[in-house]
């Protein structure tokens, strides 16, 4: 590797010695590769089109055959072939003191960025090309591009050096284009329905709105601890109290938790709050929004995900947590009449692992669901009516005070969205926050703290409100048929690599 770098440094310095800059300041582009391929793909073999174009890209392939060369370059939109002929380039070089054909052969390596000027030509073999009249070096690459991508080690390298992944793996570019499109579509859909995007604090004095461990930092001037937000919920609700009836925020969330194919400590979500609505209204909103995104990104409401076919076009199933647990496990939690020990016995018979934290029927119900049911929910399914003890910010269910008006959406065996009829009763909310605080004081680091300012806001008065959160990364996984959340996050969190303390020594051939 060092020998290749040394050779390329020599080439960069040879450009300098000839009076040319190996790292250009700017370059004027007239067209993209995508435009040219779409506009002139109709040309017959051997046909030329007299349109002057200038474009730039990274060299991916290089073939030199005597006085003719063929390069392939790529830009953000695609790739195109360059047809380079010594006679044409050298004619321009003599008159304008430009880089010659020999310079092109000797100095340009795969990985370099170059800019070219020329006209349109389709070769006799049917390859649309730029017939190059002159060229410029825009950025000399000192390291070679990788040749192969296979095996665990290379997967790790794709995540650590995403720039290399994007260069050699066109599918990765497609994934991140789809991600950008998805985010843009969500914002546009909400904006068109008169939702207002709000920016809430990332640094917060209290970490609330979810059961999760926060990242902790310290503000030096104020000499206080601060937390990276684990949700945007409580601040968005404050905006509803203040009179904004339809609000949302699409942004980054931080949770000091594990890393897996489904979890990254830093992730993207959209939270949406709509006054005068309940969780049924938010269910309808969720279905409409996600169907719109899927159709726009995939051109169909039926998609392939891994080895499954998922049909978004049918009405989505809606079923309570108790009923879906009964359907998949045979356990009827209504039959236990509040007897936790009896429920534990039935749960252990189907190999449920029960931790000491599972000390209520509601928590046990949720544990059975997560261990035995969740992974089997492939088609879009709204699971409704959650236990109150795991939903401290949701409104009680009018028909069962031990449950709340909450749903989670599951697709392909993963949670994709979470929503409530929001709890707007300040007395009930205080009691539940006090219970959460007692759990936190007893060592549960994921339990909520009491947020006095939020409780004060509720006492001012909050209208009936439905709230919803959607995980953007998991949605993009579905849209792009990606098996790991790391595939859809440009720079996922990774454990640092062990590196040598010795830095590479500079040589006399450094570009100067």
Curated annotation (Swiss-Prot):
A Pfam family it matches: tRNA_anti-codon
Gene from which the chain derives: lysS
Alphabetical list of Gene3D superfamilies matching this protein: Bira Bifunctional Protein, Domain 2, Nucleic acid-binding proteins
Name of protein: Lysine--tRNA ligase
Residues at which Mg(2+) 1 binds: 408, 415
Subcellular localization(s) per the UniProt record: Cytoplasm
One GO CC term, this protein: cytosol
Enzyme Commission number: 6.1.1.6
Single Gene Ontology MF annotation: lysine-tRNA ligase activity
